[in-house]
Amino acid sequence: MTGKKSSREKRRKRSGQEAAASLAAPDLVPVLSGSAGGCGSGGCCGVAGGGTSVAGGAERSERRKRRSTDSSSSVSGSLQQETKYLLPSLEKELFLAEHSDLEEGGLDLNVSLKPVSFYISDKKEMLQQCFCIIGEKKLQKMLPDVLKNCSVEEIKKLCQEQLELLSEKQILKILEGDNGLDSDMEEEADDGCKVAPDLISQQDTCVDSTSSLRENKQPEVLESKQGKGEDSDVLSINADAYDSDIEGPSIDEAAAAATATPAATAVATAASEVPENTVQSEAGQIDDLERDIEKSVNEILGLAESSPKEPKVATLTVPPAEDVQPSAQQLELLELEMRARAIKALMKAGDIKKPV
């Protein structure tokens, strides 16, 4: 029994060694398997079958390793090829960007440069030059949020529309850095300066016409004043009487009492001395005067009733006699009579003004 056990253990050790050898060197697996298959014992063949299965697993793992290495090598090779093609193109672009005479917007520096104001007559060309100077990238950075979604062509159209609205002077001032509002104010001031001389000339003509009219009216006014000397005396008398009425009713009553008696005596004496013809003429004149006085009194009363807060001086007009010239006594009598009439009228007006 001990001999059989020892032989079995030896076989197991050999099979283990063969398996280890097959893992280390898979090419030796067929040799070992052939040698194992040549033995006549059944136990040895069983051990050899186990060794072949272990060797097949080792081969599969090796194949997987080879595939992974092959795929990694292929990927690395493709990356190397791509870098070979991409690097020269990038280097060329960088080199051209550093050493080219063309800027971002397409401005060729080899061509002689001209100021933007040179193209002011052709607004479309001027706009194109401005866009060439700025460039699309800078333009996109400069644009506000509202216009960020617009294309370059749309922005060009908008700029063209705005340029068409501006005059050449305004464009020059904008290029020089002046504000657009200041330029508008200056143009309005220039227009105002142009209009001002026209207004001044019109005012001068108006002044000349008014001065000539005044010069023409002055002699007429002098003649009318000379012709109405007698009326002015009558008006002054009435004004004095009206002022006395404003001062107080007691003074008016005293003045009326003082002037009424001499007026009556003067009329009586004058009637005895004057002839009949003169008496008739005087009576006609007195009647006319009385009518005029009554009219004036009615006007005074109407004014007093309509506007009691704003008293006005009533003017009594005496029509001058055309044929007969009155004497000095007659004029004095007429003045006294008119005073009495005016005082009575003013007294009546004062009574109307008093509250009931």
UniProtKB/Swiss-Prot annotation:
There is a cross-link at K84 (Glycyl lysine isopeptide (Lys-Gly) (interchain with G-Cter in SUMO2)). Residues 1-24, 54-80, 208-234 are annotated as: Disordered. It comes from the Eukaryota. It holds the Pfam family CAAP1. The modification Phosphoserine is found at S68, S100, S183, S307. GO terms for biological process: apoptotic process; negative regulation of apoptotic process. The keyword Secreted does not apply. Keywords: Apoptosis, Coiled coil, Isopeptide bond, Phosphoprotein, Ubl conjugation. The modification Phosphothreonine is found at T69. The keyword S-adenosyl-L-methionine does not apply. Signal peptide: none annotated. Residues 214-231 have a biased composition (Basic and acidic residues). Anti-apoptotic protein that modulates a caspase-10 dependent mitochondrial caspase-3/9 feedback amplification loop. This is Caspase activity and apoptosis inhibitor 1. It comes from Mus musculus (Mouse).
